[in-house]
């Protein structure tokens, strides 16, 4: 009797689980059809479709690689012979992607709030000037994507040492990072980390010293430019 009773309970439980599974599958199917219908038939279907595609690739990697391949082809280049260098002009607020002497792409940028002059310390809100390289890539940065440059460089450290801005030993630590192709210390009075990131490049957009781009543009840089790439920042 007990065995028969248990069998009936187990059978009822199986039916209940099956019905619940069918119910959730039905609801998921209906919601999916409603979503697709909304994308297809609404006047804003183009916008919704674009947003849907973006949700599948929130950091823009696939699109960025495809678009950059087109820019390389337009410049007569392939990835095999692409030798990237980034040139940033503060006065004209633009970033140029070069391969040797060939221009591949140009992007508008935002720069530090104090727009004129060499960066002297971590609080002056200036974008540094000089020769740097990309020392780190951060895909989880609060500014969408981040390419850290190796500021402060040995030149920045030497200037800071002469002007007694940094402490004894700081210059040596910064020089050691340069020689090992790694990111320099950011705990000195020269500040950092600084780099190239997303979240906007309008003429009124200013930063604490980094270089800002529109998100679609930093995506193109981030997914196509490697660490170690040279970055020249001009007045």
Language-model regions, residue ranges each:
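N-terminal pre-domains immediately preceding structured catalytic cores
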Residues: 8-235
